[in-house]
A protein has these predicted regions:
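Positively charged, polar, low-complexity stretches
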Residues: 2-98
Length: 98
């Protein structure tokens, strides 16, 4: 997978920006974690949830990756329903199909 796999046609500008930023994090691992999750939920996020997702996008890759993949404690201000959804989306018991 090289990035965005869905069309952004029909998405409002804010959702398009969020999707783009989720797929262009800086590290490939975080591109995959954030981008795939964003693709799955971008159309259903409320305004408030988009605010929370934007806050997560601002977190440095190393910190966010450690919270998602390495079980490091999540600061209270980032332990939101959107973060928990992102983490749950990537909790699995089989290899990820790249």
């Amino acid at each position: 997978m090289t990035g965005l796999s869905r069309s952004t046609a029909g998405l409002e500008p804010r959702r398009k920006r969020l999707l783009f930023r989720a797929w262009h994090r800086g590290t490939r691992e975080m591109d995959l974690l954030m981008g795939r999750y964003a693709e799955s939920v971008i159309e259903t996020l409320t305004e408030g949830e988009m605010d929370l997702f934007e806050a997560l996008i601002e977190v440095p890759d190393r910190d966010l990756f450690s919270w998602i993949a390495q079980g490091e404690p999540v600061p209270e201000n980032y332990d939101t329903p959107v973060f928990r959804g992102l983490k749950a989306y990537h909790t699995h018991d089989k290899p990820i199909d790249l």
